[in-house]
Amino acid sequence: MHVSIALQRDALSALCRRFDIARLDIFGSAARATDFDPARSDADFLVKFKSDADEFSRFADFQDALGALLGRPVDLVERGAIEASRNYIRRRRILEEAQEIHAA
């Protein structure tokens, strides 16, 4: 995980508690850190909500809050969508490189 993300781990966990997040993982270049450009790269996250209640609104609000906290664009993907993906290559790649940020 890139150091700029790792330094925000406590703040990310607090944000997850505020938005009732069951699990948050980072993947992509921010997880690999080898090809992450702090000036230009976005951050990719897998999210799992504790409940389905008003999930659409929370999804957008959580994505905005993540971007504001990290000061960069954020791509947010529901973990269940990746786990259920029929594209096994993409599914395996994302799940293998994902690094846990928060679990409740």
Briefly describe each language-model feature range.
Residues L46-K48:
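Short hydrophobic/aromatic beta-strand micro-patches
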Residues M1-D25, A31-F36, K50-A104:
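Catalytic core of pol beta-like nucleotidyltransferases
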Residues T34-D35, A39-D44:
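A short, structured beta-strand/loop element
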